[in-house]
Amino acid sequence: MSRFIKGMDLSTLLELERCGAKYYDHGKERDILDIMRDYDVDTIRLRLWNDPYSETGEPYGAGCNDLAETIAIGKKVSDAGFGILLNFHYSDFWADPGKQIKPKAWKDFGVDELEQAVYDFTLENLTRIIEAGVNVTMIQVGNELSNGLLWPEGKVPNYDNIAKFVNAGIRACRKVNADIPIMIHLDNGGNNELYVRWFTNFIERGEEFEYIGLSYYPFWHGSLDQLEFNMNDIAKRFNKDL
């Protein structure tokens, strides 16, 4: 690995600002981005949801990270000198191992339509984000994909469909800018069996990517020794940076 990336997720930055949030460093009020820079943060993670509003137009909250909000935050932090890890969820709200709900607009789509929708959504939105001046330095295709994405069609163990959907996102990213590295991200970072099984199945079917991402919450995901073992094993086994 060429360098250590130190980052944090600021997807709720503007929503918190609108609510009057203030940030302090040793008791002194400061701009959050200045604080991050002084503590050597170099990358900001931003999520992108498809349509984070109810049928009546009420925002779901938690940052309401549609395209416009993501561009606004992305420009703000890019102008401050940070790189952006852009995280496509392919859902209208949180996508995680317990729920990978298809966007409302895609709810009746079959496999082929979902594959095309992932490609089109990724291509259009990534193009607009970069054209707006956001400094995208890495792209995460999906979020915590341990149990798949776009359920039920893309739910584990249906790795054929999982690969179709993730590959569509990767191809769209490469079409926009082939030099931006791609991350594939699971949860349960201490579970080596999960990572070996999932990535073995995906790599047999998948497009090339550069990084494996791991979520690790110690109260859920095992010991630090288990995390260390898993990271060392999958880095060597799959020849990927983490």
What are these regions (language model features)?
Residues 1-35:
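Boundary/entry segment of secreted carbohydrate-active catalytic domains
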Residues 10-13, 49-51, 89-93, 141-146, ...:
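Active-site beta-loop-alpha junctions enriched in small/polar residues
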Residues 28-95, 103-104, 156-183, 228-237:
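Aromatic-lined substrate-binding rim segments of carbohydrate-active enzymes
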Residues 40, 205-212, 238-241:
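Glycine-enriched alpha-helix->loop->beta-strand junction motifs that scaffold or abut catalytic
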Residues 65-69, 96-209, 221-233:
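Active-site cleft segment of glycoside hydrolase catalytic domains centered on the general acid/base Glu
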